[in-house]
From Swiss-Prot:
Catalyzes the thiamine diphosphate-dependent decarboxylation of 2-oxoglutarate and the subsequent addition of the resulting succinic semialdehyde-thiamine pyrophosphate anion to isochorismate to yield 2-succinyl-5-enolpyruvyl-6-hydroxy-3-cyclohexene-1-carboxylate (SEPHCHC). It catalyses: isochorismate + 2-oxoglutarate + H(+) = 5-enolpyruvoyl-6-hydroxy-2-succinyl-cyclohex-3-ene-1-carboxylate + CO2. This is 2-succinyl-5-enolpyruvyl-6-hydroxy-3-cyclohexene-1-carboxylate synthase. Keywords: Magnesium, Manganese, Menaquinone biosynthesis, Metal-binding, Thiamine pyrophosphate, Transferase. SUPFAM superfamilies: Thiamin diphosphate-binding fold (THDP-binding). The keyword Transferase applies. Its EC number is 2.2.1.9. Belongs to the TPP enzyme family. MenD subfamily. It comes from Leuconostoc mesenteroides subsp. mesenteroides (strain ATCC 8293 / DSM 20343 / BCRC 11652 / CCM 1803 / JCM 6124 / NCDO 523 / NBRC 100496 / NCIMB 8023 / NCTC 12954 / NRRL B-1118 / 37Y). Transmembrane segments: none annotated. It comes from the Bacteria. InterPro entries: MenaQ_synth_MenD, MenD_middle, THDP-binding, Thiamin_PyroP_enz_TPP-bd_dom, TPP_enzyme_TPP-bd. The gene is menD. It is an enzyme of class 2 (transferase).
Length: 541
């Protein structure tokens, strides 16, 4: 049985490699022993394989997500049986909601140990339910040539499914009996027949666009697949582009900070479009979608997963890559389009920010071209959307699928592990607290990441929400002050610590060379931050 396990596991690994997978994140455990050992041996023999070990499965899931999001390719998670696999759930949920390909290899107890009180045993087949595109079971210890052929085929099939739009996670469950030790240092002739899955070619007949005033809303663009086409299209046709901070579109022709402009009531009737074409996922600004609906503006949604619209406002969903749409669109625009475009580009911009917002403008000035920036949810991503300009060479990421605050540190470290230059994470203290364990990967792998922590002592975003209208219970239930010492967190993980007294000093820290992770703390107050935001809005009105 050991020989069969060894041989079939090698086929499993080779099939994953043939499917384009190069990154594996392992969380140690007993039941996953044969896969982990043979994977380590495989990685030693193949320098294309990158193997990371993360002792915390929850962190590992998001570390893998960060790599997959950055490289736009599937990443493997390997974990042991029981609740360990369930710890991947938050990352799988984010991968599902954000269309990120993940491959979960869940090792399991054999069928005779199921449902009878065996330790470290839970029902694992299809554990993630609707969050995975497919869940399959492979019995690596079954001795039959058909099983080996099945492994070769099914692994390639489900990995291909994970990268087929809409992309998403898949699970391969692997029940294993003892003995679990494989045969190492054995030369096996492992040949996996590569399967080529051709993409379905669909000729979509686009309706001609006739509009007096056309506007494009560029939403999150993880693939960075349409920026060049959008630039050519917008300049050629004088079409204004509202660019979400995650759209990767940062040019002179793009309009940023739409949320703050809408709050300042700067969008009047002259700026109302006849047609809006939306690209990508849901934008950071909820206000812009609300505006489209309240003003009853004709809206199309173009995306490989088009039709995902929680506002239920779009009138046409075109399942098509935005790049292809832009290349094949037929336009008949009126002479008013030039004037319309100019009015949008002439909208006032925020010229003075305060306090926490100054961190964004300081970051804007400090980060060099080609920098990868990961942004936490809640206030950081909203402030980035409103106040960061940057340029088109910089890549900005966030976990905006399920929009949770968990796993952000690990996701950013995963990003940092696969890019060549230093990267940056912008986060709050509560998000840091949620994923402190992720810092172990920074310690173990010496990853070049600058973590900027805006410490306003708790859940700052609630100060902007209706909950702030219940002051008697606000701090207890929503403000939730943590009162944690960020420097001691840095000391615990042997990370360099810097206290930022004024935002303008950020540039000097970021420009100081370092090959490891740094924790940069800026202390703030969420009540003051709320007041500062209101004053900035008043100045814009």
């Amino acid at each position: 049985m050991t020989d069969t396990l060894t041989f079939n596991t090698k086929h499993l690994l080779e099939a994953l490699f043939e499917s384009g997978i190069r990154h594996f994140i392992v969380s140690p455990g007993s039941r996953s022993t044969p896969i982990a050992l043979l994977l380590a041996e495989y990685a030693e023999q193949n320098n294309e394989i990158k193997l990371f070990v993360d002792v915390d499965e929850r962190s590992a899931g998001f570390f893998a997500l960060g790599i997959a999001k950055t490289l736009l390719e599937p990443v493997v998670l390997l974990g042991t049986s029981g609740t360990a696999i369930a710890e991947y759930m938050p990352a799988v949920a984010e991968a599902y909601a954000a269309n990120i390909p993940l491959v979960v290899l869940s090792t399991d107890r054999p069928q005779e140990l199921q449902f009878n009180g065996a330790p470290q045993t839970i029902p694992q087949s299809n554990l993630f339910g609707q969050l995975t595109k497919q869940a399959v079971l492979i019995r690596l210890q079954d001795m039959h040539s058909d099983v080996t052929e099945y492994i070769d085929f099914i692994v390639q099939k489900v990995v291909n499914l994970s990268i087929t739009a809409p992309r998403g996670p898949i699970q391969i469950n692997l029940p294993l009996r003892k003995p679990l030790m494989p045969v190492l240092d054995r030369q096996d002739e492992v040949h996996v027949q590569r399967v080529v899955f051709d993409k379905q070619s669909v000729q979509y007949r686009l309706p001609p666009i006739t509009a007096k005033r056309l506007l494009i809303l560029a939403g999150p663009n993880v693939l960075n697949s349409y920026d060049d086409s959008l630039k050519k299209f917008a300049i050629k046709n004088n079409v204004p582009v509202i660019a979400d901070v995650l759209s990767q579109s940062r040019h002179t022709y793009t309009i940023h900070g739409i949320d703050v402009l809408l709050q300042a009531h700067k969008i009047n009737a002259d700026l109302k479009p006849d047609l809006v074409v939306r690209f990508g996922k849901t934008p950071v600004s909820a206000r812009v979608l609300q505006w489209l609906k309240e003003e009853n503006i004709l809206t199309w949604h173009v995306d490989e997963d088009a039709g995902v619209d929680h506002t239920r406002h779009i009138v046409r969903a075109i399942k098509m890559a935005p790049h292809d749409f832009l290349e094949s669109m037929h336009l008949t625009l009126s002479k008013n389009q030039i004037d319309f475009n100019q009015k949008w580009l002439s909208l006032p911009k925020v010229i003075k920010t305060r306090n926490e917002m100054n961190i964004i403008t300081a970051l804007d000035d400090a980060v060099p071209d080609d920098t990868h920036i990961f942004v936490a949810n809640s206030m950081p991503i909203r402030d980035m959307d409103n106040f960061f300009t940057g340029n088109h060479t910089q890549r900005i990421y966030a976990n905006r699928g399920a929009n949770g605050i968990d796993g952000v540190i690990s996701s950013a470290l995963g990003m940092s592990a696969v890019v060549k230059q230093r990267s940056v994470l912008l986060t709050g203290d509560l998000t840091l607290f949620h994923d402190m364990n992720g810092l172990m990967m920074a310690k173990n792998y010496q990853l070049p990441l600058d973590i900027i922590v805006i410490n306003n002592n708790g859940g700052g975003i609630f100060s902007f929400l209706p909950q702030a209208g219940a002051p008697k219970y606000f701090e207890q239930l929503f403000g939730t002050p943590l009162n944690i010492d960020i420097k001691k967190i840095a000391d615990l993980y042997y990370i360099d610590y810097h206290q930022l007294n004024v935002p303008e000093a950020l540039s000097q820290i970021l420009q100081t060379p370092s090959k490891t992770t740094r924790l940069i703390e800026y202390k703030s107050d969420h009540q003051r931050n709320r007041d500062d935001h209101r004053e900035v809005l008043e100045m814009l009105k």
